[in-house]
C-alpha cells in the first residue's frame, strides 16, 4: 500500500479528525510495532480514538473501501497495548494493511452505584487510574489487579478472561454488562439493557445480573474478533474489615504433593473467604528476589548457583502465597485453621498480621541497606505482595521481565518491558487439581525449558478447589538470535507436548492463535459463520483466535 492512511481517509470522505489522531506508516511502526515477544509485524498505520463515535465511522469507511474493491484495511483494537508476552500492541497478521485502533484515550470511569459496588469503565481505564479514582473519591473498593501493574487495562484483561489474586479473581466473571460495536456498524447491547431502556427504567438491573435473558452473547466478545467493546460494567469487591495473608514454605521438592492437597482443601473449605492461592517453585521466587547472575552469558542457573542463592536468601523449594478476607473475627478463626492444617508438613508458616512481622518491618525499615539484606529484601517483597492482595496495583512482578535482558532496567516508577526490549513469552495452561498431575506437569516444564536453555520458573495459580492455571514466563534476550530462537522453540514444544498430556492453554499469543485455531475446531467453524454475518469484508481483527 503506497497511499498514506491520512490521505486515504480524507479522500474517502472521513473528516472527524478532531476526535481521533491518525498516524501514518512510519509513525505507527515507531509507536506500536514493539513487543516483548520478538515477533515481526508491519503496520499500515494507527488511529488513536478520542470519541466512541469514531469507531463506527471508521468501520463504515473500511467496508465502503472493501466493497468498492479499493484499498482494504483491517483494524486491530488495543486498549493500552501492554499485553506483554501475548502480543503487546501487535496485530495478529502482517499483511501490509493492518491499522492499530488505539482506545487508550477512552478512559472514562462512572460509579454506577456505590451502594451496590458497580462501576462502568472504558477500554483505556488502567489499574492505576481506577485506583486513583477510588482514592480521590474516597471509595472503599479494591481494584481488580493483576501482576502486570498500574499501566494495564482492566477491561482488556477481563475480555482476555484473565484473573488476579483478589476475591473477584475471575475478572470476566465480575463483568456484568458490556456494549460493543460490530464491524458492520451495528451496536450491541444485552437484552436486559435494551429492555430496561425501552421501558424507560433505570439502567441498573442489567448491570447487576450477568447472564441476561435468552441466549448469552456477551461471552462471544471475549478472546474473539467479533467487535470492539467500548464500555463495560464490573462488580467491585468492597475493602474488607479484616485481612491477613499467609506464606507457607515447603523444604523439599517432593513436598509439592502435600502443598497441592493443602491448597485444594483450603479453597474447598473457605470459598469466598480465602482468595486464589499461588504456589511458586524455588526458581520463581529467586527471580523475584535477585537479578539474574548469568544475564551476560545467557546460561541457565547452575545447581551450585541455585544452592548458594537458596541459602543466602532463605528460599524454599515451594512457597504458597494466599490471603484471607472478611470480618476480623472470621479472618482470625480461618487463620487458626489454616495454620493447623499446614503445620504437619510446612517448613515455615508466616502470616502478615503476626506481631513478629510487624516488629520486623518497623525495625528493619530504619536499618541501612547493607544490614541483613536478605531479610530486608523479603520484607519488601512481602509488603508489595500484600498491596496487590489488598487490591492496590504495583510493580512487584515487573522485574521478572528483565531477568534475561541486557538492557538496563528503567528507573521510572512504571516500567515498560516492551520499550526496554525485554524478552518475554507466556505459557499458561490449565492443570487438573491433583498432586499427580502437578508433578507430571512440573517435570514436563523443567525438561522442555532446560532443553532450550530457558530457566523453568513455575507458578500455579489455584483459582478454585478444582482448577489450576500455571503461568511459566519464557524469558530471553531479544538482542541474541539464538536466545530468541530458543524461546520460541521452547514455547512451541511446551504447548504441543503439553496438549498431548492434557495441559491446555487458556490463553494464547498472536502466533499461537494462528497455529492452533486453524479451522479444525468445531467452535471455530461456528464462529466463522458468525463472523461472516457481521464482518463480511473482514475489516476487524483477522487472525484473532481463528478469525
Stretches found by the model and what they are:
Residues 204, 218, 233-234, 244-255, ...:
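C-terminal cap/substrate-recognition region of VAO/PCMH-type FAD-linked oxidoreductases
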Amino acid at each position: 500500500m503506497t497511499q498514506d492512511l491520512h490521505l486515504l481517509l480524507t479522500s474517502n470522505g472521513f473528516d472527524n479528525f478532531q476526535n481521533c489522531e491518525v498516524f501514518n506508516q512510519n509513525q505507527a511502526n515507531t509507536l506500536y510495532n514493539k513487543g516483548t515477544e520478538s515477533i515481526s509485524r508491519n503496520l499500515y498505520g494507527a488511529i488513536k480514538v478520542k470519541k466512541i463515535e469514531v469507531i463506527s465511522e471508521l468501520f463504515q469507511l473500511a467496508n465502503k473501501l472493501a466493497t468498492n474493491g479499493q484499498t482494504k484495511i483491517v483494524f486491530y483494537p488495543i486498549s493500552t497495548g501492554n499485553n506483554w508476552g501475548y502480543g503487546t500492541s501487535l496485530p495478529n497478521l502482517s499483511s501490509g494493511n493492518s491499522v492499530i485502533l488505539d482506545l487508550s484515550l477512552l478512559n472514562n470511569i462512572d460509579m454506577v452505584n456505590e451502594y451496590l459496588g458497580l462501576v462502568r469503565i472504558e477500554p483505556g481505564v488502567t489499574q492505576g487510574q481506577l485506583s486513583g479514582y477510588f482514592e480521590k473519591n474516597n471509595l472503599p473498593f479494591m481494584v481488580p489487579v493483576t501482576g502486570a501493574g498500574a499501566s494495564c487495562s482492566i477491561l482488556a484483561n477481563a475480555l482476555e478472561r484473565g484473573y488476579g489474586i483478589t476475591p473477584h479473581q475471575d475478572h470476566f466473571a465480575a463483568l456484568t454488562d458490556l456494549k460493543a460495536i460490530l464491524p458492520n456498524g451495528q451496536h450491541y447491547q444485552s437484552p436486559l439493557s435494551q429492555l430496561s431502556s425501552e421501558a424507560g427504567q433505570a439502567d441498573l438491573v442489567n448491570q447487576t445480573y450477568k447472564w441476561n435473558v435468552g441466549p448469552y452473547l456477551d461471552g462471544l466478545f471475549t478472546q474473539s474478533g467479533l467487535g470492539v467493546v467500548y464500555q463495560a460494567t464490573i462488580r467491585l469487591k468492597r475493602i474488607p474489615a479484616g485481612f491477613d495473608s499467609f506464606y507457607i514454605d515447603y523444604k523439599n521438592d517432593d513436598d509439592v504433593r502435600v502443598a497441592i492437597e493443602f491448597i485444594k482443601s483450603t479453597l474447598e473449605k473457605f470459598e469466598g473467604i480465602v482468595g486464589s492461592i499461588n504456589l511458586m517453585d524455588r526458581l520463581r521466587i529467586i527471580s523475584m528476589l535477585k537479578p539474574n547472575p548469568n544475564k551476560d552469558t545467557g546460561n541457565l542457573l547452575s545447581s551450585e548457583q541455585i544452592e548458594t542463592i537458596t541459602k543466602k536468601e532463605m528460599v524454599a523449594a515451594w512457597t504458597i502465597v494466599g490471603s484471607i478476607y472478611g470480618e476480623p473475627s472470621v479472618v482470625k478463626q480461618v487463620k487458626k485453621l489454616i495454620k493447623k492444617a499446614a503445620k504437619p508438613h510446612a517448613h515455615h508458616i508466616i502470616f502478615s498480621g503476626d506481631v513478629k512481622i510487624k516488629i520486623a518491618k518497623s525495625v528493619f525499615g530504619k536499618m541501612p541497606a547493607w544490614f541483613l539484606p536478605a531479610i530486608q529484601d523479603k520484607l519488601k517483597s512481602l509488603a508489595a505482595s500484600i498491596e496487590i492482595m489488598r487490591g492496590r496495583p504495583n510493580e512487584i512482578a515487573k522485574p521478572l521481565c528483565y531477568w534475561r535482558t541486557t538492557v538496563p532496567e528503567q528507573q521510572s516508577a512504571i516500567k515498560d518491558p516492551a520499550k526496554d526490549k525485554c524478552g518475554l513469552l507466556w505459557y499458561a495452561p490449565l492443570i487438573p487439581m491433583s498432586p499427580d498431575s502437578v508433578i507430571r506437569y512440573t517435570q514436563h516444564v523443567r525438561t522442555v525449558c532446560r532443553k532450550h536453555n530457558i530457566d523453568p520458573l513455575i507458578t500455579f495459580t489455584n483459582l478454585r478447589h478444582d482448577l489450576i492455571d500455571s503461568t511459566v514466563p519464557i524469558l530471553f534476550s531479544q538482542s541474541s538470535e539464538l536466545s530468541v530462537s530458543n524461546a520460541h522453540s521452547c514455547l512451541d514444544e511446551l504447548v504441543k507436548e503439553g496438549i498431548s498430556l492434557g495441559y491446555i492453554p487458556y490463553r494464547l499469543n498472536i502466533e499461537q492463535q494462528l497455529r492452533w485455531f486453524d479451522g479444525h475446531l468445531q467452535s471455530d467453524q461456528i464462529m466463522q459463520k458468525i463472523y461472516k454475518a457481521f464482518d463480511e469484508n473482514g475489516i476487524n481483527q483477522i487472525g484473532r483466535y481463528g478469525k
